Regions:
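Arg/Lys-rich, positively charged N-terminal/basic patches that mediate binding to nucleic acids
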Residues: 1-37
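Residue-level preference for alpha-helix termini and adjacent loops
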Residues: 2-4, 23, 47, 57-60, ...
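Charge-dense, helix-prone N-terminal extensions
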Residues: 6, 12, 25-27, 56, ...
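Short connector loops at helix/strand junctions that flank enzyme active sites
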Residues: 34, 56, 64-66, 74-76, ...
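A short, surface-exposed loop/turn module that caps and links secondary-structure elements
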Residues: 44-67
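Enriched for short, Lys/Arg-rich terminal
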Residues: 69-113
């Protein structure tokens, strides 16, 4: 998938190994790299469809974060992103997830805290 990171500070922290370790610590930096690499290697978000999501536990957010998705990084932190959808109507959710081939990384945060 195509990954965009509009926030310059977050982009620097996620794309540079030294900055990622400095900002998030060594263990979390490793897990963030794995998640970012997995997302970039995916053909579409359907590769993370919930029944087959694995350790990422990709899911859509609810409440104030509705419209965003998250993947687990290191408890309690999640990588939040917004999907770039090219059309509105889909027959089912899996089809909608398969149409998502570009995402915008928004933040790394504890969504329950």
């Amino acid at each position: 998938m195509e990954l965009a990171i509009p926030d310059k500070k977050l982009k620097k922290a996620l794309e540079n190994d030294a900055e990622r370790r400095k900002r998030f610590g060594s263990d979390m930096a490793k897990k963030l790299k794995i998640r970012m690499d997995s997302l970039a290697a995916a053909e579409s978000l359907a590769d993370f469809w919930p029944p087959a999501s694995g350790p990422e536990r990709c899911h859509e957010m609810k409440g104030d974060l509705k419209g965003q998705f998250s993947v687990d990084v290191k408890q309690p932190y999640r990588l939040l992103f917004r999907a770039q959808v090219t059309r509105e109507a889909f027959d089912d959710e899996r089809e909608r997830w398969a149409a998502i081939k570009s995402i915008e990384i928004l933040s790394v945060e504890d969504t329950h805290g």
